[in-house]
């Protein structure tokens, strides 16, 4: 394992993707032990529908789900993004078939995670982003309707600490229409009524259609669904 990690590209960060119910999920802690020696590790945890799991897969998922959150909260890994297959299925329900089920779900997860990652590494034209506390390392991502502000989050986070909204707006619209900023401010103010903290970033794009994403953060360990 050491030889394998040594041959990986010399980048500062590493994304570790896993599903807790997989046959090799039990090896995740050992793999992470080697990865964290070289990289700042971000963890993307795909949570299966626990009601459909067999006994062994159920126990594997429950153990990994808890222990890896403890890893994140302690700082052993930089962050842990929780994604529920069931929640993503609800978002895509009208476009899913038996043949494309997993491809469509994985496509949406990958696209959303990628876009949020891009915006986190790109200078916005306007923002008031709130920095997380050192123990706030567990989160989920989601999609936001740009016009209405309706959210579709990929995991139901309990006891959230804050949210950050990422608005991607056509660059010409940003230059010509002040209503864009007014709409964003209105949405964020509405969210802040029920939250400890909410912030936003606005990014220019060349896409004709404007769209938005959200990160929902917490410093608390998320319980297993039936607990």
Annotate the PLM regions:
Residues 1-227:
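Tubulin/FtsZ superfamily GTPase core signature
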């Amino acid at each position: 394992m050491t030889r394998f990690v040594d041959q990986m590209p010399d980048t500062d960060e590493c994304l570790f993707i896993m599903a807790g119910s997989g046959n090799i999920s039990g090896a995740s802690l050992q793999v992470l032990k080697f990865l964290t020696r070289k990289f700042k590790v971000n963890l993307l945890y795909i949570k299966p529908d626990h009601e459909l799991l067999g006994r062994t897969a159920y126990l594997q998922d429950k153990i990994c789900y808890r222990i890896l959150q403890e890893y994140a909260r302690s700082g052993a890994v930089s962050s842990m993004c929780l994604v529920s297959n069931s929640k993503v299925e609800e978002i895509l329900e009208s476009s899913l078939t038996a043949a494309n089920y997993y491809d469509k779900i994985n496509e949406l997860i990958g696209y959303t995670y990628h876009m949020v990652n891009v915006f986190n590494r790109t200078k916005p034209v306007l923002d008031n982003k709130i920095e997380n506390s050192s123990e706030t390392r567990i989160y989920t991502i989601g999609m936001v309707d740009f016009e209405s502000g309706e959210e579709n989050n990929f995991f139901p986070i309990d006891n959230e600490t804050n949210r950050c909204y990422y608005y991607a707006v056509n660059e010409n619209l940003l230059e010509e229409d002040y209503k864009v900023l007014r709409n964003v401010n209105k949405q964020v103010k509405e969210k802040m009524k029920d939250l400890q903290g909410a912030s936003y970033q606005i990014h220019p794009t060349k896409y004709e259609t404007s769209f938005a994403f959200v990160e929902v953060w917490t410093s608390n360990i998320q319980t297993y669904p039936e607990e």
